Amino acid sequence: MACCEPKDNSKKSLWKTSLVFMTVKVLIHYSFHFIVPLFFVKIFFKDNWKEAFAIMLLTMLIDLDHLLASPIFDASRCSIGYHPLHTVYAAIFYLMLSFSPSWKLKAVSIGCLWHLSTDYIDCLL
């Protein structure tokens, strides 16, 4: 390989920095955070779906742990395992909440676990 030839992964990295890719990534990420929970509440919380949807949206507050990082936002950083409320230990706690008899705590559990899933999907993109 000559010194100036692009590496094999240069097309992939060029694609990942393209405006189209970044736009699609942002659309997927935020629709998963704000639209998909509506489907969860319609399935699991039919009687209290509006309250459950509000609770699930409030689970976005776990992103406040990003304020502890420097820089606060880094598009190339994976949140999972980096921020305190995005760790395996936090996920275990969120999972334990799902065993509560309270539907509100179950909504918090599903919201937080879906939030972590969404952030993990973002890491894979």
Predicted feature locations:
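N-terminal membrane-targeting hydrophobic helices
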Residues: M1-L125
